[in-house]
């Protein structure tokens, strides 16, 4: 039986009584954001809106984006990535579970030195698929030229943000490449791997 989104008490500054809000709204107030689904236009717009709002509220406090995503549509994912580069606060990215496809692209887009994976997280990179917009029925299929441009864009970002040579990234993107947290760290996709049962990082 589904439990829905859990609610937690929250007391606004100056208020005597707490009100019940859903757990994600409470965490957003602490600048903790979550991508826990496929990347699509809806979640992309929500995360972009939150990042912009929280940046306006305080441009000096870092943002934290927790990722557990199998990937999704390229353009909404690139929009999240671009917003992360645009907003003044540093955006920490934290991989928990899986960051695959566009999930790994968003993960690598975190502030360099502030990208973390949990010990048993998995990361997967590959080239973009041929679906372009929000249709999976093949209604909107990328022309080969457009697909090539997208692949070049994604490859260039991975090269820039991992420090790996172009030929290494290009070769990896030819197929699905799955990595453990430590392999993702060695690959330059994350900077740190969390240590179990402690607050320390390696």
From Swiss-Prot:
EC id: 3.4.21.92
PROSITE patterns: CLP_PROTEASE_HIS (PS00382), CLP_PROTEASE_SER (PS00381)
A single GO cellular-component term on record: endopeptidase Clp complex
Pfam annotation, one family: CLP_protease
Alphabetical UniProt keywords: Chloroplast, Hydrolase, Plastid, Protease, Serine protease
EC main group: hydrolase
One GO BP annotation of this record: protein quality control for misfolded or incompletely synthesized proteins
PANTHER family attached to this UniProt entry: ATP-DEPENDENT CLP PROTEASE PROTEOLYTIC SUBUNIT, CHLOROPLASTIC ATP-DEPENDENT CLP PROTEASE PROTEOLYTIC SUBUNIT 1
Family: Belongs to the peptidase S14 family.
Listed name of the protein: ATP-dependent Clp protease proteolytic subunit
Protein's organism: Nandina domestica (Heavenly bamboo)
Upper classification of the organism: Eukaryota, Viridiplantae, Streptophyta, Embryophyta, Tracheophyta
Gene: clpP
């Amino acid at each position: 039986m589904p439990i829905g989104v859990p609610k937690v008490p929250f007391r606004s500054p100056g208020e005597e009584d707490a009100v019940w809000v859903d757990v994600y709204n409470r965490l957003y107030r602490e600048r903790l954001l979550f991508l826990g689904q496929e990347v699509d236009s809806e979640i992309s717009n929500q995360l972009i809106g939150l990042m912009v709002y929280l940046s306006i509220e305080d441009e000096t406090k870092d943002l934290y984006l927790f990722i557990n995503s199998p990937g999704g549509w390229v353009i909404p994912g690139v929009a999240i990535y671009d917003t992360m580069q645009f907003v003044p606060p540093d955006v920490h990215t934290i991989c928990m579970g899986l960051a695959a496809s566009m999930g790994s692209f968003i993960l690598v887009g975190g502030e360099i030195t502030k990208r973390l994976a949990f010990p048993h997280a998995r990361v997967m990179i590959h080239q973009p698929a041929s679906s372009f917009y929000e249709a999976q029925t093949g209604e909107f299929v990328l022309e080969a030229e457009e697909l090539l441009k997208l692949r070049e864009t994604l490859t260039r970002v991975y090269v820039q943000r991992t420090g790996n040579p172009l030929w290494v990234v290009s070769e990896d993107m030819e197929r699905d490449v799955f990595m453990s947290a430590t392999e993702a760290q060695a690959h330059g996709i994350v900077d740190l791997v969390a240590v179990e049962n402690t607050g320390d990082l390696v």
